[in-house]
Regions:
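Rossmann-fold dinucleotide-binding core
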Residues: 4, 96-175
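NAD(P)+-binding Rossmann beta1-loop-alpha1 motif at the extreme N-terminus of oxidoreductases
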Residues: 1-64, 125
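Helical "substrate-binding/catalytic lid" subdomain
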Residues: 166-255, 261-276
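Rossmann-fold NAD(P) dinucleotide-binding segment
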Residues: 51-63, 67-115
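Hydrophobic beta-strand scaffold residues
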Residues: 27, 47, 115-117, 158, ...
Length: 276
């Protein structure tokens, strides 16, 4: 049975600890913020004095810190995980960071015979508490098999994306899609406002009339064989409607840089499809 440690018990870390408690797992934890440690103590966790001390008493360490610098420091720095970890310890990096950072940490860990997997989280604390967290994971199939039972105590689904670092890439592109939708909707309602449409009415219309994420029908938009990532142009959308809305924004004198870039991207896709 794995002995579980956790570095970083902020909002996400505490939510993960709640799930682990429900599964009967008592973790040893460390954080630089004392009030968070007291909340972890209230959940029945043991408190360590450093990341190294967590690793000394663990076979599996969840790393739930915020930035690339934080990950490097708490794993490879003084009093970090690698200073205390025994051979065959598995470090699961849950932070949203660059894949190159994951690979840098993995390279440092190899000298200590410590394994590293990026197991990035797709959700917020309420998602975790509701048991709906998903993990996108990069690492070998053997390490995935070891990590998955632990991950499923904290979430509902694990997606293996490929080798080390691909979990981090997957998290970033997933958030890229989510964030870009918000930004383009903002530009769309600016165009609607300029055309006399109150934005709540525009948003309600777009929600009710045929708005469907491309992800729900990606096999119709992209080649499902995986051989060609070029999207199909779509009847009248990329070759007519997107250019028209770009013209409309110019007529209104609006600064909509994402829409303008979409117009250029649509033209390239239409041309590429014509040349196939």
């Amino acid at each position: 049975m794995e002995q579980v440690g956790m570095i970083g018990v902020g909002a996400m870390g505490l939510a993960l600890l709640e799930r682990l408690k429900l599964a009967g797992v008592q973790a040893i934890v460390y954080d630089t913020y004392a009030p968070s440690l007291e909340q972890a103590r209230a959940l029945g966790c043991r408190i360590a004095s450093s990341a190294a001390d967590v690793a000394r008493e663990s076979t599996l360490v969840d790393v739930v810190v915020r930035t690339d610098v934080d990950v490097i420091q708490c794993v490879t720095g003084p009093d970090g995980v690698l200073e205390g970890a025994k051979p065959d310890t598995l470090a699961l990096i849950h932070s949203s960071i660059l894949p190159q950072t994951v690979q840098q940490v993995e390279a440092a860990a190899q000298s200590k015979s410590v394994f590293v997997v990026d197991a990035c989280m797709t959700g917020v604390p309420d998602t975790v508490r509701g048991g709906n967290l998903c993990f996108v994971v990069g690492g070998t199939k053997e390490l995935l098999a070891r990590a998955e039972p632990h991950l499923l105590k904290m979430g509902k689904q694990v997606f293996h994306m490929g080798p080390t670092g691909t979990g981090a890439v997957a998290k970033l592109i997933k958030n890229m899609v989510s964030g870009s939708e918000t930004l383009i909707v903002y530009e769309a309602i600016q165009i609607g406002l300029a055309g006399g449409i109150p934005y709540p009415k525009a948003l309600e219309m777009m929600r009710e009339i045929g708005h469907d994420s491309v992800l729900n029908r990606w096999q119709r938009t992209f080649d499902p064989s995986g051989e060609n990532p070029l999207p199909k142009s779509g009847r009248n959308v990329m070759n007519k409607d997107i250019p028209l809305v770009c013209d409309l924004a110019k007529l209104y004198g609006l600064d909509v840089p994402i829409t303008e870039q979409l117009g250029r991207a649509a033209a390239r896709i239409v041309k590429a499809n014509e040349e196939r």
